[in-house]
């Protein structure tokens, strides 16, 4: 990418704000707002009529990596036609739909460690051979070139050593494939020392319990080549002994805890199997762990355990996985990724099915990664709570009280350390707070402080997932709270942060989740973003022409103001087919500012104000048509002509509704009632969006709609005051006002997200979308906004 620094467009003044990205600057070329955007080209427009100009439904070029090249080559077609891009997107969408529709209990990579535990099960008829020979075949076929087993693409000493030791045990137990076991033993001996310097964050789950058990079994088998007296092994044993003293056996036997997941690590303890068998899931597993279930079967020969083991082997072609089912985890994280990448609209029915499925297994204590686990974790519960609430489900926030202890929130019972991603997911969930939900306020404060502290100390590594850009994702999430998060800004940054298939999940070994970490998701998102971005760039071309022809600058509104207005529209309503809504959003914002500027200008006479209002009424009633400007009322005629052009671009029914909305706003403006611009914008957008089927005129008079309008107007008026102070370089923070805005935003979120009764959910969502743009403008630094404008509208996606 070319040298990036913040664009100083039209000498914009940059001031401090409560939320600001790192001091990254973007120097844009002249083409950012230059003449190239005003050029006409036969390649630029296709047959979409809007306001007597043509705006392309699908723009005919894709922005190049260099901004200068965009200037020079804007009229050149890309090497890859948009038809091919569309086909590629459609093919990938079809693939993802098939993936989501076949998600079943979740797609997860095979685990060498768990397969080895299955291989250790002796023949049920008493013969000296494995009960499941397919596991031995899998182990023999999947040894890596260096003699180890484990994740081939991401190296970690923990993952490789525990997988290799388990597989060596399986081969030596049945005295098969001696050359492979010898090679594995050599690997262990030569690489054991790497544990001394291995990153603790990459330690696999329960390693300090599981590795000693495997070592003991190896020693009992007479595998003497391993240096059992090595300092690192002694250290691991000491850690194990310390941890075992903190595991109360009475609790282990009484209720389902996270310890069950690594129960094979308790092999040498006095376990009461009669009590433990009561903690099985209905599927027969122990906390959805194949290895733990295999361990239990060795001691109990329980039929339900055997049924679960056979199910796993059948599902994964003779091998095992780290954890199964992962049906809830897979569905929730898949939905989250699709939403953040900005492509969820392609999978609405699949997402609906996923969330409906998750809700079926929701309990008052939350959920786990797999159904029927008799155990609940904060990570899945947080993700589930947020997504279900955002999709209209009635969710009780008191579910989080089960994870709170001594002022902190923990993922699993008995957790000794906090997880970065778990805390971040709780933080995201807490931002959907409704009024009076104190537990979510406590959660948000705890999470924000925890994450800020970790960020300040540059400790942004997680114990559950290894993701290349996780630290950047966390920082961006802290800097852009949900109230100020615009869909296209979020998608643009998440495209940078999402690693696709490069994500590695940490269980008792490393595993991959195709439903969650999928390169197809990213490919669709990149192609779609570029496609939409090209469309937005041509719309921006049109908007600049409109700016000139409408004499907007005469009302003190700069081209930069127009750019920000269009950006807010495009960052919120980004889909290619919604050109009309974006244009109307930007125009309505600018025209209302023009009229408001006219009304509040000291030089505007009462006669001129009356002339504007009378002219508008005459125009509505068909008694007057703008034909030419009278010199004594030049500004009045400019405003009437611009407003007439804006309202005349719709069919008769929509135009009638829009004229009424603008009449209401003008009346309020005349009466000195400030802050109704948000209501005007919402109503305009809902009419323009085609909600007129459900958007009957009587809806405007319904109490729910009035409540939403009044609340949105109040919020946006206060946010405008904050934004004006920011522009005027004043920094007199008003904590009382901030708290009032926070409370009102919570009330608005509640009204919008609760299940729709009288008003269509899409109509209500427009109120929140508009309010979020005001929140964004008030609390995000001007310098940061310029970076976002560049990234969303102009910077190519690489």
From Swiss-Prot:
A motif (DXDD motif) lies at residues 377-380. GO terms for cellular component: chloroplast. InterPro entries: Isoprenoid_synthase_dom_sf, Terpene_synth_N, Terpene_synth_N_sf, Terpene_synthase-like, Terpenoid_cyclase/PrenylTrfase. Pfam families: Terpene_synth. It is found in: Plastid, Chloroplast. Mostly expressed in trichomes of leaves and fruits. Substrate binds at residues 243, 463. Pathway: Secondary metabolite biosynthesis; terpenoid biosynthesis. Mg(2+) binds at residues 377, 379. It catalyses: peregrinol diphosphate = (2E,6E,10E)-geranylgeranyl diphosphate + H2O. Its cofactor is Mg(2+). GO terms for molecular function: isomerase activity; magnesium ion binding; peregrinol diphosphate synthase activity; terpene synthase activity. Keywords: Chloroplast, Isomerase, Lyase, Magnesium, Metal-binding, Plastid, Transit peptide. The keyword Chloroplast applies. Its EC number is 4.2.1.174. Belongs to the terpene synthase family. The Asp-Xaa-Asp-Asp (DXDD) motif is important for the catalytic activity, presumably through binding to Mg(2+). Involved in the biosynthesis of labdane-type diterpenoid including cleroda-dienols, and peregrinol lactones and furan derivatives, dopaminergic diterpenoids that can bind to dopamine receptors in the human pituitary gland, have probably ability to lower prolactin levels, and are used to treat menstrual cycle disorders (e.g. premenstrual syndrome and mastodynia). Terpene synthase that produces peregrinol diphosphate from geranylgeranyl diphosphate (GGPP). PANTHER family: COPAL-8-OL DIPHOSPHATE HYDRATASE, CHLOROPLASTIC (PTHR31739:SF30), ENT-COPALYL DIPHOSPHATE SYNTHASE, CHLOROPLASTIC (PTHR31739). This is Peregrinol diphosphate synthase TPS1, chloroplastic.
């Amino acid at each position: 990418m070319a040298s990036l620094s913040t664009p100083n467009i039209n000498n914009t003044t940059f001031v401090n704000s409560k939320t600001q990205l790192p001091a990254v600057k973007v120097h844009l070329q002249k083409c950012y707002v230059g003449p190239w955007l005003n050029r006409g080209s036969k390649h630029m427009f296709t047959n979409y009529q809007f306001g007597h100009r043509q705006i392309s439904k699908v723009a005919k070029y894709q922005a190049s990596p260099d901004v200068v090249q965009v200037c020079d080559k804007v009229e050149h077609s890309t090497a890859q036609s948009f038809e091919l891009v569309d086909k590629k997107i459609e093919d990938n969408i079809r693939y993802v739909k098939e993936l989501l529709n076949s998600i079943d209990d979740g797609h997860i990579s095979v685990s060498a460690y768990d397969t080895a535990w299955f291989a250790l099960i002796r023949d049920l008829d008493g013969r000296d051979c494995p009960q499941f020979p397919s596991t031995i075949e899998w182990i023999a076929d999947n040894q890596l070139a260096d003699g180890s087993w484990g994740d081939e693409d991401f190296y970690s000493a923990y993952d490789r050593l525990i997988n290799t030791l388990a597989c060596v045990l399986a081969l030596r137990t049945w005295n098969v494939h001696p050359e492979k076991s010898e090679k594995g033993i050599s690997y262990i001996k030569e690489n054991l020392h790497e544990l001394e310097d291995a990153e603790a964050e990459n330690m696999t789950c329960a390693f300090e319990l599981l590795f000693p058990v495997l070592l003991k079994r190896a020693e009992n088998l007479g595998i003497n080549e391993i240096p059992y007296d090595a300092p690192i092994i002694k250290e691991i044993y000491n850690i194990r002994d310390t941890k075992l003293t903190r595991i109360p056996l009475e609790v282990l036997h009484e209720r389902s805890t996270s310890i069950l997941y690594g129960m094979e690590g308790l092999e040498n303890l006095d376990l009461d199997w009669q009590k433990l068998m009561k903690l099985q899931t209905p599927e027969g597993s122990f906390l959805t762990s194949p290895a733990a279930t295999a361990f239990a079967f060795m001691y109990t020969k329980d039929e339900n355990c055997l049924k679960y083991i056979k199910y796993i082997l059948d599902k994964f072609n003779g091998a095992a996985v780290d954890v199964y089912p992962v049906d809830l985890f897979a569905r929730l994280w898949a939905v989250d990724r699709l939403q953040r990448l900005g492509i969820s609209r392609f999978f609405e029915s699949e997402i609906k099915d996923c969330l409906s499925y998750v809700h079926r297994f929701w309990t008052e204590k939350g959920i786990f990664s797999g159904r029927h686990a008799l155990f609940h974790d904060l990570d899945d519960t947080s993700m589930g709570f947020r997504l279900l609430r955002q999709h209209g489900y009635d969710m009780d926030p008191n579910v989080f009280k089960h994870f709170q202890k001594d002022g902190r929130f923990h993922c699993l019972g008995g957790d000794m350390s906090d997880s970065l991603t778990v805390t971040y997911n709780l933080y995201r969930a807490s931002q959907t707070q409704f009024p009076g939900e104190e537990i979510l306020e406590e959660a948000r404060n705890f999470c924000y402080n925890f994450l800020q502290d970790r960020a300040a100390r540059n400790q942004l590594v997680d114990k559950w997932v290894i993701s290349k850009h996780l630290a950047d994702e966390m920082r961006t999430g802290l800097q852009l709270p949900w109230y100020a998060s615009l869909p296209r800004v979020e998608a643009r940054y998440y495209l940078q942060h999402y690693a696709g298939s490069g994500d590695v999940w940490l269980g008792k070994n490393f595993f991959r989740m195709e439903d969650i970490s999928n390169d197809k998701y990213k490919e669709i998102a990149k192609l779609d973003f570029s496609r939409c971005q090209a469309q937005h760039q041509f719309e921006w071309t049109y908007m600049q022409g409109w700016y000139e022809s409408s004499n907007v600058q005469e009302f003190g509104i700069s081209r930069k103001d127009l750019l920000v207005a269009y950006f807010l529209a495009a960052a919120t309503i980004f889909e290619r087919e919604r050109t009309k809504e974006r244009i109307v959003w930007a125009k309505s914002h600018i025209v209302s500012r023009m009229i408001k500027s006219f009304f509040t200008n000291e030089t505007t006479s009462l006669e001129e104000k009356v002339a504007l209002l009378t002219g508008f009424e005459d125009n509505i009633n068909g008694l007057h048509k703008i034909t030419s400007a009278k010199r004594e009322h030049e500004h009045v005629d400019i405003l009437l002509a611009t407003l007439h052009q804006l309202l005349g671009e719709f069919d008769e029914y929509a135009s009638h509704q829009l004229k009424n909305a603008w009449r209401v706003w003008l009346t309020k403006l005349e009466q000195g009632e400030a802050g109704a611009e948000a209501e005007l914008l919402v109503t305009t957008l809902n009419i323009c969006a085609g909600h007129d089927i459900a958007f009957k005129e009587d809806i405007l008079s319904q109490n729910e709609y009035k409540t939403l309008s009044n609340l949105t107007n109040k919020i946006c008026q206060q946010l405008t005051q904050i934004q004006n102070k920011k522009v005027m370089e004043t920094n007199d923070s008003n904590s009382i006002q901030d708290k009032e805005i926070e409370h009102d935003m919570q009330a608005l979120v509640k009204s919008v997200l609760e299940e729709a009764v009288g008003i269509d959910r899409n109509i209500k969502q427009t109120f929140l979308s508009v309010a979020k743009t005001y929140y964004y403008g008030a609390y995000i630094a001007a310098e940061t906004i310029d970076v976002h404008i560049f990234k969303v509208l102009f910077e190519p996606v690489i």
